């Protein structure tokens, strides 16, 4: 091959390589453009690990979904009409409880970024159920988790995440600064109630759709506190119960009626010798029933029921199947406070069905361990200790904690009745275990009129963590 032929051959090869390279670059540009068009153009594509954020604009829901793709957030929107959660239906007839969620927050938090929390509770709109919780401004297995056994601090905040997920900075939404809280949905937007401030002058901040709409000042200057579970909404109005005063003596109790986040009416209960704290409230046939904690002198639970005009009735669950902790062994009940082992207590709940009652309680009579559901067909009004159903939820050898009620409205379930549900806090760490922190995970169950099973669904995290050693 002479020199001219070599030059022509080499030039031809270079030209072919250049053309191929140019075609590859053009193909790459087209591929990137098509991929970007698909990501930004598809308004209805479901992606895993989406975070849905609901905003309220001109009486129309806008469901904003931030889809994480290659560390870039692309915003998609679709309008969802608001409704009114009527709350006029009766509780659904049930025969037992089906497991609904379990977040395993402590187990996941040994290696992942999970908030140190307490007082978790669940509330549902007509679109979704969310877990609300009070953080300590710290993560598990981190130095700031030290000393988080304390109930009230300026670092505590109310946050929420999708039900069943471990609460982390990546899936959680800030709601309010609070060391005591409640939240509920009226069919249009979320109402949150967050109490913070000094013990002798705390203030409850009400937010509607994330915007401050009202405040409630402590009226007895003695640790204003509220439910630590969902408020209850009927026909566009939402209701909550607050306490102000001693935790071991006569205190003051008020019911508040709120509309679009503003207090429109309140009434103070005339309840001498009663003690109401941390009420678990639910709607039933257009009225509200709350079952609460007596931290003063009752090992059975006090209740208050009221209509939308705040006309109320009060009493104690009469059953000899006692619902508080600590408590005596089951025996003869009373429609007033049962005094033996009546001091102190734990947040709890019950569901009234006529003269009968579903009672949720710890299995242990003197520690926050184990959990069970008991059906006493005459327990709301009768004082004997007989019952017909017991369903195991957590074994007595495993820790439990607070528990509370929530409901699923027909607008969510498609049923013609209000489904009763409950959650159980599974407390881990101090003061019972050798850690520097106190936190918890949670489980939840909903009532069904079909097959169910009793078992134990414990937290089951292996302690201590690295930070504790």
Swiss-Prot record:
Subunit structure comment from the entry: Homotetramer.
Gene Ontology MF: a single term: exo-alpha-sialidase activity
Biological role: Catalyzes the removal of terminal sialic acid residues from viral and cellular glycoconjugates. Cleaves off the terminal sialic acids on the glycosylated HA during virus budding to facilitate virus release. Additionally helps virus spread through the circulation by further removing sialic acids from the cell surface. These cleavages prevent self-aggregation and ensure the efficient spread of the progeny virus from cell to cell. Otherwise, infection would be limited to one round of replication.
Inhibition and activation profile: Inhibited by the neuraminidase inhibitors zanamivir (Relenza) and oseltamivir (Tamiflu). These drugs interfere with the release of progeny virus from infected cells and are effective against all influenza strains. Resistance to neuraminidase inhibitors is quite rare.
Cofactor dependence: Ca(2+)
Keyword DNA-binding on entry: no
Active-site residues annotated for this sequence: 151 (proton donor/acceptor), 402 (nucleophile)
UniProt keyword annotations, A-Z: Calcium, Disulfide bond, Glycoprotein, Glycosidase, Host cell membrane, Host membrane, Hydrolase, Membrane, Metal-binding, Signal-anchor, Transmembrane, Transmembrane helix, Virion
Modifications after synthesis and translation: N-glycosylated.
GO-annotated biological processes: carbohydrate metabolic process; viral budding from plasma membrane
InterPro entries for the chain: Glyco_hydro_34, Sialidase_Influenza_A/B, Sialidase_sf
Membrane topology: Single-pass type II membrane protein
GO CC entries: host cell plasma membrane; membrane; virion membrane
Region span, Involved in apical transport and lipid raft association: 11-33
Binding site for Ca(2+): 294, 298, 324
Protein name, entry field: Neuraminidase
Membrane-crossing segments per the record: 7-27
Positions annotated with a glycan in the UniProt record: 50, 58, 63, 68, 88, 146, 235
EC number(s) recorded for this UniProt protein: 3.2.1.18
Keyword 4Fe-4S: no
């Amino acid at each position: 091959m002479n020199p001219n032929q070599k030059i022509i051959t080499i030039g031809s090869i270079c030209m072919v390589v250049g053309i191929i390279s140019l075609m590859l670059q053009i193909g790459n540009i087209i591929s990137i453009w098509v991929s970007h068009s698909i990501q930004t153009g598809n308004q209805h594509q479901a992606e895993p690990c989406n975070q849905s954020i609901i905003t309220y604009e001109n009486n129309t829901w806008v469901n904003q979904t931030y889809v994480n793709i290659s560390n870039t957030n692309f915003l998609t929107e679709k309008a969802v009409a608001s409704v009114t959660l009527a709350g006029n239906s009766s509780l659904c007839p049930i025969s037992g409880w089906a497991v609904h969620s379990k977040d395993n927050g402590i187990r996941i938090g040994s290696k992942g970024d999970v908030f140190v929390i307490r007082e978790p509770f669940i509330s549902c709109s007509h679109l979704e159920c969310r877990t609300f919780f009070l953080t300590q401004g710290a993560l598990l297995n981190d130095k700031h988790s030290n000393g988080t056994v304390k109930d009230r601090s300026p670092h505590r905040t109310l946050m929420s995440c999708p039900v069943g997920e471990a609460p982390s900075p990546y899936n959680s939404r800030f709601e309010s600064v609070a060391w005591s809280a409640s939240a509920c949905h009226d069919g249009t937007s979320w109402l949150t109630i967050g109490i913070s401030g000094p013990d002798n002058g705390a203030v409850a901040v009400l937010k509607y759709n994330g915007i401050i709409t009202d405040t409630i000042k402590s009226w007895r200057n003695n640790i204003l506190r509220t439910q630590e579970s969902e408020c209850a909404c009927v026909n566009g109005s939402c209701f909550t119960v607050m306490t102000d005063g001693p935790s071991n003596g006569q205190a003051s109790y008020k019911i508040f009626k709120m509309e679009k986040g503003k207090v429109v009416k309140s009434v103070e209960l005339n309840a001498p010798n009663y003690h109401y704290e941390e009420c678990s409230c639910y709607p039933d046939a257009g009225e509200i029933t709350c079952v609460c904690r007596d931290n003063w002198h009752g090992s059975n639970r006090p209740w208050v029921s009221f209509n939308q005009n705040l006309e109320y009735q009060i009493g104690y669950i009469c059953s000899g199947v006692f619902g508080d902790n600590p408590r005596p062994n089951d025996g003869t009940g009373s429609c007033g406070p049962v005094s033996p082992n009546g001091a102190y207590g734990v947040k709890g709940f019950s569901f009234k069905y006529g003269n009968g009652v579903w009672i949720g309680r710890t299995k242990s009579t003197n520690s926050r361990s184990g959990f069970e559901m008991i059906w006493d067909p005459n327990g709301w009004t009768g004082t004997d200790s007989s019952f017909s159903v017991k369903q195991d939820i957590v074994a007595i050898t495993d820790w439990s904690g607070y528990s509370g009620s929530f409901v699923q409205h027909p607008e969510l379930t498609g049923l013609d009745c209000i489904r009763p549900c409950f959650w159980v806090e599974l407390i881990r760490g101090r003061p019972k275990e050798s850690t520097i922190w106190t936190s918890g995970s949670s489980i939840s169950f909903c009532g069904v009129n079909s097959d169910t099973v009793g078992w134990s669904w414990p937290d089951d995290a292996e302690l201590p963590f690295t930070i504790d050693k």
